[in-house]
Amino acid sequence: MAKEELIEMSGMVVEVLPDSRFRVTLDNGHNLVAYSAGKMRKHHIRILCGDKVSLELSPYDLSKGRITFRHLEGRGPLGPQRRRR
């Protein structure tokens, strides 16, 4: 049996919730609760309020999603860069 197609959307994080979940407002105005993907947790990618993110939604439950990518546009500098030896 083939896996169902996931719906790709983009939105903005409006609230950080406990248990690494986030309230996200999609570009079309809908609100949903999303969690960060396992690879994002593995590589310690931090998601903050106001970040633009890409999400995957299941066609069966459109109120929950998985954050798969964080866009860096509009963010300030990340801090001083360390020199490698």
Curated annotation (Swiss-Prot):
Membership in a protein family: Belongs to the IF-1 family.
NCBIfam families: infA
Keywords attached to this entry: Cytoplasm, Initiation factor, Protein biosynthesis, RNA-binding, rRNA-binding
Coarse class of the protein's main subcellular location: cytoplasm
InterPro entries: NA-bd_OB-fold (IPR012340), RNA-binding_domain_S1_IF1 (IPR006196), TIF_IF1 (IPR004368)
Intracellular or extracellular location(s): Cytoplasm
A GO-annotated cellular component: cytosol
Gene coding for it: infA1
Assembly notes: Component of the 30S ribosomal translation pre-initiation complex which assembles on the 30S ribosome in the order IF-2 and IF-3, IF-1 and N-formylmethionyl-tRNA(fMet); mRNA recruitment can occur at any time during PIC assembly.
Residue intervals of the S1-like domain: 1-72
Region forming the signal peptide: none
Molecular-function annotations in GO: ribosome binding; rRNA binding; translation initiation factor activity
Annotated protein name in UniProt: Translation initiation factor IF-1 1
One Pfam family recorded for the sequence: eIF-1a
Gene3D superfamilies: Nucleic acid-binding proteins
Described purpose of this protein according to its UniProt entry: One of the essential components for the initiation of protein synthesis. Stabilizes the binding of IF-2 and IF-3 on the 30S subunit to which N-formylmethionyl-tRNA(fMet) subsequently binds. Helps modulate mRNA selection, yielding the 30S pre-initiation complex (PIC). Upon addition of the 50S ribosomal subunit IF-1, IF-2 and IF-3 are released leaving the mature 70S translation initiation complex.
